[in-house]
Structures are given as structure tokens and as C-alpha cells.
């Protein structure tokens, strides 16, 4: 994967320079541990046939992403309070096997790449025993100034500090 070199500057913001293959923490994302978020399929998650509706997967991915960031010390309410939002700007989902009413599974998520203010998150939903894979996805977030609606030039320091813990 190609991405910009990240370097920590004195005010703990991230600046970008030339493009080279680098990963947060210096390791390939395949080596990074997954954050695990349990899901249970309730009636409101399903369509008329008892199969999980495609939008439920997206909602679960957002819940898992918020909890993943919280586990690193970043509370979304704090990001909002300082005027930052992390909207989804790209989403790719591959549904591999349907989840059905009453099933339980694990949604795994991890940071795969950072380029400037853009973060790419990998997700997958697997059976509790890990033998079945139901869905894989990639979500791209961008840091935005909530008031102006413009992409930020650098990540907020609280987010930078959390991402540095991945190294």
C-alpha cells in the first residue's frame, strides 16, 4: 500500500511529505491485531426473510469503529466538541454469507492506513469460532472541520496521540 510518510511535529499534529509504503506503527496492517465488537442479530436488523438487511452491517461497522477509537482513548463526543468530524467518504462492502435472525458474530475492525487526514479502516464479520466469514469491508474517513464543512489540514492532536499508541 502506498501512503504518505507521517511525522510527528512539535505541536503533536501530523504533517505529510512524499508518498512511500508505510503503515501506522510501522507494521503491515495484516500484522496489527483486530478490535473485536460482538453483534447479535435482532428482528429490527433483518428484512422480511429474516436475513440481515445490508444497512445493519453499516450501522454495526460504525458502532465498532466508535468503540475502537474509544479503546484508543478517542471519544467521538470530544472530537465533536473540538469541532472535528470523521465522515465516511468511501465504503466498500463484500457480503460473503448472510447472517440470520438470532445469530451472533464478531465484527473485527482495525486501522489499515493513514494518509494525511484520511484514515482507512478494515472490517470483517466472522462467526464466534472464526471459521465462517460473513462480510468484509473497507471504510475511508476524513477529518473535517464541523463548522466550515472543509477537510482539515491536519489531524487533531488528541487523534494523533491515540494513533501513535499503535506504534
Which functions belong to the PLM regions below?
Residues 68-119, 135, 142:
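Hydrophobic beta-strand-centered segment that forms part of the acyl-chain substrate-binding groove
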Residues 4-33, 37, 100-104, 112-167:
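HotDog/MaoC-like acyl-thioester-processing domains
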Residues 35, 50-51, 84-86, 132:
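Residues that recognize and position ribonucleotide moieties
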Residues 11-71:
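Catalytic strand-loop segment that frames the active site of acyl-thioester-processing enzymes
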Residues 39-43, 95, 143:
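Hydrophobic residues in beta-strands and at strand termini
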Amino acid at each position: 500500500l502506498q501512503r504518505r510518510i507521517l511525522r510527528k511535529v512539535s505541536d503533536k499534529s501530523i504533517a505529510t511529505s512524499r508518498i512511500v509504503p508505510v503503515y501506522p506503527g510501522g507494521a503491515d496492517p495484516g500484522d496489527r491485531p483486530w478490535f473485536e465488537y460482538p453483534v447479535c442479530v435482532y428482528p429490527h436488523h433483518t428484512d422480511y426473510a429474516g436475513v440481515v438487511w445490508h444497512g445493519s452491517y453499516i450501522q454495526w461497522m460504525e458502532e465498532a469503529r466508535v468503540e475502537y477509537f474509544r479503546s484508543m482513548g478517542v471519544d467521538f463526543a470530544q472530537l465533536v466538541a473540538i469541532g472535528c468530524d470523521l465522515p465516511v467518504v468511501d465504503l466498500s462492502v463484500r457480503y460473503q454469507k448472510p447472517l440470520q435472525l438470532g445469530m451472533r458474530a464478531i465484527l473485527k475492525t482495525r486501522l489499515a492506513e493513514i494518509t494525511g487526514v484520511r484514515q482507512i479502516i478494515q472490517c470483517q464479520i466472522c462467526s464466534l469460532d472464526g471459521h465462517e466469514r460473513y462480510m468484509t469491508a473497507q471504510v475511508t474517513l476524513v477529518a473535517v472541520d464541523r463548522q466550515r464543512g472543509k477537510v482539515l489540514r491536519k489531524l487533531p492532536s488528541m487523534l494523533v496521540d491515540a494513533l501513535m499508541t499503535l506504534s
